Amino acid sequence: MRSRFSGAVTSADLLHHVTEVCRHPDFSELRFSILDFRDAKDAVNDEDLLEVRAQIIGAQVTNPHILVAALTTDPGVIEHLTRFIRLGALNRQIQVFSTPELAMDWIAEQSMFRLH
């Protein structure tokens, strides 16, 4: 699944994405989600990230193997995402990339690693 964000990204925007992914009929089998922040100018503040983290932790019970690739080149968005990653919600299952191609290469590599 993929979501594209633009402008100032709010916790409501991210929670909407997480909710949509979790409601997907095949959520337990989904292998990746792409968050495209390339058109975003600002990201969620730290307090709101904790709310998103709580939702993600709950979703991991159903699908502990889902990978999340975030796309951005904006230094501010990268900073916010880096802090979110440090919260440990996805156990190294989230990475930030500058292009969709790099993200898909990582997803393919991680998927192959899990099969062996």
Placement of each model-derived feature along the sequence:
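Amphipathic, Lys/Arg-enriched alpha-helical "gate/interface" segment within cytosolic domains
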Residues: 1-116
